[in-house]
C-alpha cells in the first residue's frame, strides 16, 4: 500500500453529528502488500478488522481496532522470507479537525492523518499501526548462519567453496591476544 492511495473510507458523519452515535463494524482488509522505504512486503494472511469509533468529548474521537495480519519479511541474515504476525489491538484518541483547521500539535505529529473531515481511512490507520509494531530485526531462526559474503550462498542450506578470508587484518592483534589466552 502506498501511503497516498487508499480505498477504504469509513463514514464518521453519525459520530461527529450532534447525536454522537458510535460506529462498531467488521471491515474486510483490502491490503495485499505493505510498502516501506521503497520495499514491498506481501501480506500473507489477514483477518477482518473489528473497528469501533465513538465520540470521546471535547472534539475528540476514540478509535479502537482489533485484527491479525501476517506479513512476509526477509530474514536480516539469509534473506529468506519469514512470516511475521502482527496482532493489532489498539485504542487511539484523536482530535477532530474543526471547520478544516487542525491543531498545531496534531499537524506536527501527523498522528491522525487517517481522519479527513467526516471519513476515517482504514488503510492509513492500519499502515500506521503496522509501522508502530514493525520489528527492528527479523531472523528465520536464532542460529541463522546468513549468506556467504563472497558468493551469496545461503549457509543454512549448505557450505560454499569460497575461501575463508578469515578476520580483517586490522583485528589480528585481538586474534593474537585470544591465541595467547587459550595457551595459558
Question: Where in the sequence are the language-model features?
Answer:
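Structured interface patches
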Residues: 1-184
Amino acid at each position: 500500500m502506498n501511503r497516498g492511495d487508499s480505498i477504504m473510507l469509513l463514514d464518521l458523519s453519525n459520530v461527529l453529528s450532534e447525536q454522537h452515535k458510535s460506529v462498531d463494524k467488521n471491515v474486510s482488509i483490502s491490503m495485499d502488500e505493505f510498502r516501506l522505504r521503497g520495499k514491498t512486503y506481501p501480506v500473507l494472511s489477514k483477518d477482518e478488522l473489528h473497528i469501533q469509533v465513538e465520540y470521546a468529548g471535547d472534539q475528540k474521537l476514540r478509535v479502537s481496532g482489533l485484527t491479525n495480519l501476517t506479513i512476509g519479511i526477509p530474514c536480516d541474515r539469509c534473506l529468506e522470507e519469514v512470516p511475521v504476525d502482527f496482532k493489532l489491538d489498539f485504542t487511539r484518541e484523536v482530535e477532530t479537525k474543526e471547520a478544516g483547521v487542525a491543531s498545531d500539535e496534531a499537524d506536527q505529529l501527523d498522528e491522525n492523518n487517517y481522519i479527513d473531515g467526516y471519513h476515517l481511512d482504514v488503510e492509513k490507520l492500519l499502515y500506521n499501526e503496522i509501522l508502530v509494531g514493525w520489528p527492528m530485526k527479523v531472523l528465520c531462526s536464532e542460529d541463522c548462519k546468513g549468506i556467504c559474503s563472497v558468493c551469496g550462498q545461503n549457509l543454512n542450506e549448505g557450505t560454499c567453496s569460497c575461501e575463508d578470508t578469515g578476520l580483517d587484518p586490522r583485528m589480528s592483534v585481538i586474534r593474537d591476544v585470544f591465541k595467547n589466552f587459550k595457551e595459558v
